């Protein structure tokens, strides 16, 4: 079993909350979005920085428990750019992943932090980004189970998205409560998880912090999800 918190820090504003979040019981990893990667510490509590994006003004990062997991490799990736990326803030890297080995069970896995294009882009672009991210993580993991957690910026038509990712062997799992409430017409589940080779046991929306997004806690067990078994 692995327990991961994902949090969009809202332009790094919520960075000071990470020390307390890292104290979450039995927490194994953190996936961050909208952080200033150059200012991230190497350690947050007992979590170690696996990797972060390098070229973004606001980037992504993955932390993991070094006593529980061994890091095999990691990499950040560019995805198809939205108009927002081309005109405004440079955000070429929207995915960072780390291949880990569970020291207890021997399982290999890929853990990734993902941030899709903003709401000014079309859902079709975000679907292309998600599909490309899944393919890149499969290459990184060489067939290892995948957890891709983050800000998908996909509050509407999620059932359609779930059907599409299922066709490629992934499960989409929302949290128990919505994760974004800043905009009246775009409240909902922005932050969630897509996975392959895991059984998602729980996705809990945690208490609100200073970000416009609310952190989520994913609890997952090793084992094929229903979409893979049915394939």
Labelled PLM ranges:
Residues 4-12, 81-89, 120-122:
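Acidic/histidine-rich helix-loop elements
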Residues 29-110, 114, 199, 205-208:
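Structured beta-strand-rich core segments of catalytic domains in phosphoester-bond hydrolases
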Residues 73-74, 138-144, 152-231:
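Metal-dependent phosphoester-hydrolase catalytic domains
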Residues 126-134:
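Charged helix-capping and loop-helix junction motifs
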Residues 1-6, 225-227:
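Membrane-interface helix-coil boundary segments and nearby low-complexity
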Residues 15-16, 39-43, 47, 123, ...:
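Short glycine-/acidic-enriched loop or helix-start segments at secondary-structure transitions
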Residues 4-9, 18-41, 63, 98, ...:
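Active-site beta-strand/loop signature of hydrolases that rely on acidic residues for catalysis
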Residues 12-16, 57, 187:
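Structural motif corresponding to alpha-helix initiation and N-cap regions
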């Amino acid at each position: 079993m692995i327990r991961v918190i994902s949090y969009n820090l809202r332009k790094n504003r919520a960075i000071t909350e990470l020390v307390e979040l890292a104290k979450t019981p039995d927490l194994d990893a953190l996936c961050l979005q909208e952080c200033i990667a150059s200012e991230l510490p190497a350690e947050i509590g007992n979590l170690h920085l696996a990797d972060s994006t390098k070229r973004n003004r606001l980037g992504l990062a993955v932390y993991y428990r070094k006593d529980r997991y061994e890091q095999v490799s990691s990499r950040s990736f560019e995805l198809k750019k939205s108009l927002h990326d081309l005109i405004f803030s440079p955000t070429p890297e929207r995915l960072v992943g780390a291949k880990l080995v569970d020291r207890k069970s021997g399982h290999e896995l890929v853990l990734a932090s993902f941030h899709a294009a903003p709401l000014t882009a079309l859902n079709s672009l975000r679907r292309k980004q998600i599909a490309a991210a899944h393919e890149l993580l499969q290459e990184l993991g060489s067939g290892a189970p995948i957890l891709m957690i983050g800000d998908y910026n996909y509050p509407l038509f999620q059932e359609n998205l779930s059907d599409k990712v299922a066709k490629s062997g992934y499960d989409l799992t929302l949290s128990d409560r919505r994760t974004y409430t800043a905009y009246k017409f775009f409240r909902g589940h922005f932050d969630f998880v897509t996975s392959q080779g895991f059984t998602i046991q729980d996705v809990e929306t945690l208490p609100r912090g200073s970000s416009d997004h609310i952190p989520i806690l994913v609890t997952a067990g090793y084992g094929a999800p229903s979409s893979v078994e049915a394939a």
